[in-house]
UniProtKB/Swiss-Prot annotation:
It comes from Gallus gallus. Disulfide bonds: none annotated. InterPro entries: TPD52 (IPR007327). This is Tumor protein D53 homolog. One of its GO terms (molecular function) is protein homodimerization activity. GO terms for cellular component: cytoplasm; early endosome; perinuclear region of cytoplasm. Residues 185-197 have a biased composition (Polar residues). Keywords: Coiled coil. Forms a homodimer or heterodimer with other members of the family. PANTHER family: TUMOR PROTEIN D52 (PTHR19307), TUMOR PROTEIN D53 (PTHR19307:SF8). Belongs to the TPD52 family. It comes from the Eukaryota.
Amino acid sequence: MERQARGLLETQSLHEADEDMVTDVDFTSMISEEEKEELKAELAKLEDEISTLRQVLAAKEKHLIEIKQKLGMSLMNELKQNFSKSWHDMQTTSAYKKTHETLSHAGQKATAAISNVGTAISKKFGDMRSHSISYSIRHSISMPAMRNSPTFKSFEEKVETTVTSLKTKVGGTSHTGGSFEEVLSSTAHASAQSSLAGTRLPESEEELQC
């Protein structure tokens, strides 16, 4: 095995050496003067043809620009057309289609989530409004019932009695009846008159003493 490996290595090194020798060989010494002249003539001919082709290409490009200008095709329009074509080509690729489908699916999920949140908020506000309305209805219904209760009537009678006694003290005429709001108003008025009478009594006594 070792001998075979060494033989292969020696063969490869000899082959590489032969290639190096070939590249270093000067081919000019292997051709005749006539062949050199023919090759030089062919080279000059090729250079002339290339130069002519370049001139023809430049003339054709100039003519192309003139035609586009006459047709109103500007450079910007050409760029737009190229961009549109590139965009169309990109949209037809499988990678773009897969990415577009993924983003579309994600957008649908986001829209559904936002819709669910909006529905929940609307439902919450609706429940709060219904609760407020029902509370107002219960409150309006419970007020007459409360005023007709024995406890409230007893309190109302006590207030009326107090108003009557206050009016008697200040020399007013006593009368019963009326709504509870009128009774409370009469109580406040009677209390004010009682306070005013209390402040005037000492002045009368001082005048009598004088």
